[in-house]
A protein has these predicted regions:
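N-terminal membrane-targeting hydrophobic helices
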Residues: 1-177
Length: 177
């Protein structure tokens, strides 16, 4: 969690706990939106929807590690977001998930969730989203809604083009997220 200069109406330095709760719902909602077509195509919509909603704000657990605290004030006073808030980390994690699961939909979902998180945070500034580069440390605010719309579109394409994946017993597998 960090003050969003690009979204000043979403945070309040006087109310860091309220800002943290707001950030959880914002990141969870955006994450669910960007992979909603894949979630809706799944047999376990509710479970996957909840996991996706939790996954969006879970990206911010790196703040807790960097601040060594769960206190919202400690999280807000970090100089910048941790280096794991980067496109490089998103791509590396996506590649690792794909190597382990061989699931394009699951891997895409991980990438879309993290990138949607980065889009929102980078529009607020102080985000080394192209780590290890220090600049640019933000994106134009309009890139956030455009990027989120493109992620949703790509998820729609992914959900409509992928055949149902089955495990060795012929059952739909977890990869059908």
């Amino acid at each position: 969690m960090h003050p969003y200069r690009g979204w000043p109406f979403l945070t309040s330095p006087q109310h860091p706990t309220l800002s943290a709760v707001g950030a959880v719902f914002i990141h969870g909602g955006i994450s669910l939106f960007v992979v909603l077509p894949i979630v809706l195509r799944s047999d376990k919509r509710v479970l996957y929807g909840v996991l996706v909603f939790i996954g969006g704000p879970a990206v911010d657990l790196d703040h807790v590690v960097a601040a060594s605290s769960f206190r919202p004030h400690a999280l807000e006073t970090l100089k910048h977001r941790p280096d794991t808030h980067s496109l490089l980390f998103a791509l590396a994690l996506t590649a690792l998930v794909y190597l382990i699961t061989r699931s394009k939909q699951l891997s895409w979902s991980i990438l879309a969730i993290i990138v949607s998180h980065l889009l929102f945070d980078a529009a607020g500034g102080d985000e080394y989203w192209l780590y290890p580069l220090k600049h640019p440390n933000s994106i134009p605010w309009l890139a956030c809604p455009i990027g989120i719309a493109l992620l949703f579109w790509a998820s729609t394409r992914m959900a409509s083009s992928a055949p149902p994946e089955r495990d060795s017993r012929g059952q739909r597998s977890f990869a059908q997220t």
